[in-house]
Amino acid sequence: MIAQWYRWRNDAMMASMNVADRSHARVIRIQQAIREQPGLDGWLFYDFRHLDPIAYRVLLLDPSLHVTRRWYYWVPAQGTPVKLQHRIEPHVLDGLPGDARAYVSWRDQQAALGSLLHSAKRIAMQYSPMNAIPYLSRVDAGTIDLVRSLGAEVVTSADLVQQFEAVWDDAQLASHQVAAEGLRAIVDEAFGFVGTSLAARSSLT
């Protein structure tokens, strides 16, 4: 019963906030986290055929999305995020807030990315220096080379990722509190039963 209540309450809380609202709130949190990192201009998310599951979880994207082309999502410390997607798949990031741009060819992509990051000097990506954290190392070396060739310094997103992967959100905390209250009630009831049974000298089994 407690487990069912736990699941019901969590589902109800999440359902009360639509996808767009959740995505908008998440991006606000991401920008707050970026601003807490000294000298960081933004966080660049990148994926090709689901190579980066971290990006999908942090951005609250549907993991079942059909993705066959590269996409980028630039979240600056300040200002409006930007989506860069292939023209064949222009709706992959529809659930995320921000301006949308499209590319067709490799040259288009490179030029669009350069325009996107023209003022950014220090960028976080799912990259781990010396592959120290394999779990985090999701962006291929070629893409790192591409971003660096545009004049930006690429740094690890480890400190940012842990704020979303290793910390409860409000809904998870609320669900935990409901479960804790239920367990406390069960413990109190069990000890009450034991006390009553001992006082009456009746069997507990």
Predicted regions and their residues:
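Flexible, acidic/His-enriched mid-domain "rim/lid" segments that flank
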Residues: 2-11, 27, 108-205
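N-terminal accessory/capping or targeting/presequence segment of soluble
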Residues: 2-115, 181, 185
